[in-house]
Each structure stands twice: as structure tokens, then as C-alpha cells.
Amino acid sequence: MSAKTTPKGLKEVTYNDAVARSKEYFGGDELAATVWVSKYALKDSFGHIYESSPEDMHHRIAAEIERIEKNYPNPLSRDEIFALLDHFRYVIPQGGPMTGIGNNLQIASLSNCFVIGHKKPADSYGGIFRMDEEQVQI
């Protein structure tokens, strides 16, 4: 895919434009803006950027969550979901989900981390081996 060809319905934005718009979103915080653009903005596998601020990302995530919500009784609307995400007020997705939810341009993990453990104490040889077995299965 060349820089002139964009995925259907998406508009490519420059890094500088995305940083400028994100800096506004983050109240002038350049570090937050550059980190967001570098790590979490929607990109294709060539590094082309398709979101210019976390607001765009929140719309993407809200659209995908709404798609799933429709499978259940009393689903939240896209606007309700967006309101929960907007400005990271009530729901703050972790890095992997921010990058991956609704991202059809790259394969991304939706999990960040998880806890392993055993009901029994792990401070014995047997407990250590049980932990090792769990880690191998990951």
C-alpha cells in the first residue's frame, strides 16, 4: 500500500498534524501527545497514521464495542460508550486494547498482562514447578 492509497474510509494524517491535534487534546502536554501518536494512534503496517487524536481512537473503540454490545440485551449505544471513554474519564483502556480494538489494519493483541498463580502456596519445590507449568502453557 503506498502513501497515496488509504484503506477504505480512512484519511491519512501526518505525524506532525497528529501530534499538534493530540497536544491540544492533552492540554498542551507534548510528551503525552507524542507518546500517544507513536504508540496508540491507528496505523497500518507501513506506519501510516489514520487517527489524529485520542478522540478519534475513542470513536474507533466505541464503534467496535457497540458492535459487540448489540449481541446482548440492553446494549449501550456508541455515544454512551464514547462518553465513558472520552478524555479517559471513566474507562481507561490499556495499551494493547487502545491499539487493537477496532484496528483492522494490523494484527494486535487485545491483552496486556494477566496474573498466574495457584491456590496453594508457591514457596515449595512443588509450588514452583506448578508455576512453571502454568507459565509454559501461556
Labelled PLM ranges:
Residues 1-138:
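Extended catalytic cores of very large enzyme megasubunits
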